Amino acid sequence: MKTPKDIAGLFKTAAQTELLLSQDGSVPPFVLPEDVATMRFVIDTLMPQIADLRARRIVWLRSQGLCWKSVAKEVGLTESQAKRVFCKTLREITVFYNQINVSET
């Protein structure tokens, strides 16, 4: 069973890997295949589960390492509202992640 903190870690790995890969299209030797697989899983499976585009943007910006003030400004919310949306979205994604992993075993 994953926690929201674990899911946030998956998103962080995906965002950082995506930044490294998008610079020139090739896979640098220091990027692990597991990180690329995590990025693909997050982008292809978890991100589409976030129906609210603003919530999706908040999660992705925060995963890239932006501070709450920058995230809030980018999406037009206060910092506390952005944090609330982020936490709520991670809880929802955690439930989805745990459901798909239980059904696979």
Task: Spell out what each predicted region is.
Residues 1-49, 69-70, 75, 79-81, ...:
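N-terminal interaction/assembly modules
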Residues 50-66:
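Short amphipathic alpha helix immediately N-terminal
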